[in-house]
């Protein structure tokens, strides 16, 4: 092999390695992606059982039910549609009815959303961006004007 051929084979091998590394990186990132949905968006979305998503909205009034141990069942709503959610773990201190929440998890085979994390808004003037945008688009939520 001539010197030029060796150099060309090293360059081609390096480019092939970089291409494979880039492809594997994008594949891994695609597997970890978690898309955000409001309850009404789920009627048109094709979410498979077991697919990780983020579900956001307001905790529906009168739906919080404490189960055995640290298991809690509640519904997340955008006032157009509600989704039943179960969560096992310690809820944030600010978790309560009619407050903004983002849950992350997947749907079980029974159609109930099984959350493995729950995020609640941190004060009365803050709403998670995804939830606020979704509720504003549906005309449900308006920002309060601070004085």
Curated annotation (Swiss-Prot):
Presence of keyword Transmembrane helix: yes
Spans traversing the lipid bilayer: 8-28
Coiled-coil portions: none
Ligand binding (heme): 122, 126
Membrane topology (Periplasmic): 29-147
Keyword annotations of the record: Cell inner membrane, Cell membrane, Cytochrome c-type biogenesis, Heme, Iron, Membrane, Metal-binding, Signal-anchor, Transmembrane, Transmembrane helix
Family stated for the protein in its record: Belongs to the CcmE/CycJ family.
Name this protein carries in UniProt: Cytochrome c-type biogenesis protein CcmE
Source species taxonomy: Bacteria, Pseudomonadati, Pseudomonadota, Alphaproteobacteria, Hyphomicrobiales
Gene that encodes it: ccmE
